[in-house]
UniProtKB/Swiss-Prot annotation:
Organism from which the protein derives: Serratia proteamaculans (strain 568)
SUPFAM superfamilies tied to this protein: C-terminal domain of alpha and beta subunits of F1 ATP synthase (SSF47917), N-terminal domain of alpha and beta subunits of F1 ATP synthase (SSF50615), P-loop containing nucleoside triphosphate hydrolases (SSF52540)
UniProt keyword Hydrolase, yes or no: no
Major location category of this protein: membrane
Name recorded for this polypeptide: ATP synthase subunit beta
Length: 460
């Protein structure tokens, strides 16, 4: 193993000089002995003259010129397999839950090629989430990729936690959760939520939170993905949750600037599309097993045309768009049924009835959207009888799209509901057909099935 020495430290970027005949490869891991602390660096560029430019995977506090650096001669490797289940690890796969060693049998490098074209498999099976608006409007495919788009504070993490709770309990497979640049408090809440739901022994948790250096946040998504790939290659159907994919892009922007690359649009790194592609192309299903991924995507300033969310859109099968306008009406989950889409919403995949009900719901809501201006200026009385009926049904549909969540029980005080797809379709079909025109609209707010709405109406 070749050794070199640090010649420059600028924040998270460290330049290391090696002998000319032993220069480490790009993406190799280097180890710095800094007193009791061991710091891992990852080679990003070879500058010539035996000098390599690296990104630190931990804090560079206390580093100084002249410190000895060892080339480990392989990329960062992390534990994979069943030993990782129920544990919290950092970007290097080291345990951070005070429960001793992982005790893994195998370690894999975090940089791996994506599966080859002939190994890929696609699936038409639907994944039932138990959340009405998602199952109806933007159904998820098993082995597909789903993005949860939303600005600050509209409920991405709560939706993500509800999905994990519902799918992990209903679906008996393994899950991997990568917390990329999110709040440590949320990571803590999430751990206890999994523990209380008795699904912790089926989830591997990898955290690189907001307080970590950019190198750490940039690589932690790959660490989680590598663990998911191992489960997939064993022939399992695995779930990969990433919260938040935007922070992965942001960490890439920070690293890119530190490495001296010229920024592109809005200050993002010039390699934005490539970095996103490298990650997303590995999140895929093969003939041996599948990875179904759910990714939260922060939308800066609620602008979906920002380069980061816009680049992410291209890779997804289903997009769930969370809207601030809907959240302000108190309707949670604040999913925008007119903006959310799924490739699976096709009569050949979901069946004709599901397709017709979903499109019918969207057309009623769209018509209501158009009538809002008239109502604001002239009032409801100026509408035709037909339009009054559309508005009344649209408002019921809008409220029926809300649902109490299990993970939000402590805030709402009402028990969570898991609604089967069959009940969801039946409920919305009934509202559209006018079976519930006699019920007041508040009966449809925060209930599970349509029967609950009927019961609630009796109490009003």
């Amino acid at each position: 193993m070749a050794t070199g020495k640090i010649i420059q430290v600028i924040g998270a970027v460290v330049d290391v000089e090696f002998p000319q005949d032993a220069v480490p490869k790009v993406y190799n891991a280097l180890e710095v002995e800094n007193g009791a602390n061991k710091l891992v660096l990852e080679v990003q560029q070879q500058l010539g003259g035996g000098v390599v430019r690296c990104i630190a995977m931990g804090t560079s506090d206390g580093l100084r010129r002249g410190l000895k650096v060892t080339d480990l001669d392989h990329p960062i490797e992390v534990p994979v397999g069943k030993a990782t289940l129920g544990r919290i690890m950092n970007v290097l796969g080291e345990p951070i839950d005070m429960k001793g060693d992982i005790g893994e049998e195998e370690r894999w490098a975090i940089h791996r090629p994506a599966p080859s074209y002939e190994d890929l498999a696609n699936s038409q099976d639907l994944l039932e989430t138990g959340i009405k608006v998602m199952d109806l409007i933007c159904p998820f495919a098993k082995g597909g990729k789903v993005g949860l788009f939303g600005g600050a504070g509209v409920g991405k993490t709560v939706n993500m936690m509800e999905l994990i709770r519902n799918i992990a309990i209903e679906h008996s497979g393994y899950s991997v959760f990568a917390g990329v640049g999110e709040r440590t408090r949320e990571g803590n809440d999430f751990y206890h939520e999994m523990n209380d739901s008795n699904v912790l022994d089926k989830v591997s948790l990898v955290y690189g939170q907001m307080n970590e250096p950019p190198g750490n946040r940039l690589r932690v998504a790959l660490t989680g993905l590598t663990m998911a790939e191992k489960f997939r290659d064993e022939g399992r159907d695995v779930l990969l949750f990433v919260d938040n994919i935007y922070r992965y892009t942001l960490a890439g922007t920070e690293v890119s600037a530190l490495l001296g690359r010229m920024p592109s649009a809005v200050g993002y790194q010039p390699t934005l599309a490539e970095e996103m592609g490298v990650l997303q192309e590995r999140i895929t299903s093969t003939k041996t097993g599948s990875i179904t991924s759910v990714q939260a995507v922060y939308v800066p300033a609620d602008d979906l045309t920002d380069p980061s969310p816009a680049t992410t859109f291209a890779h997804l099968d289903a997009t769930v768009v969370l809207s601030r306008n809907i959240a302000s009406l108190g309707i949670y989950p604040a999913v925008d049924p007119l903006d959310s889409t799924s490739r699976q919403l096709d009569p050949l995949v979901v069946g004709q009835e599901h397709y017709d009900v979903a499109r019918g719901v969207q057309s009623i809501l769209q018509r209501y959207q158009e009538l809002k201006d008239i109502i604001a200026i002239l009032g409801m009385d100026e509408l035709s009888e037909e339009d009054k009926l559309v508005v009344s049904r649209a408002r019921k549909i809008q409220r029926f799209l809300s649902q109490p969540f299990f993970v939000a029980e402590v805030f709402t005080g009402s028990p969570g509901k898991f609604v089967s797809l069959k009940d969801t379709i039946r409920g919305f079909k009934g509202i559209m057909d006018g079976d519930y025109d006699h019920l007041p609209e508040q009966a449809f707010y925060m209930v599970g099935t349509i029967e609950e709405a009927v019961e609630k109406a009796k109490k009003l």
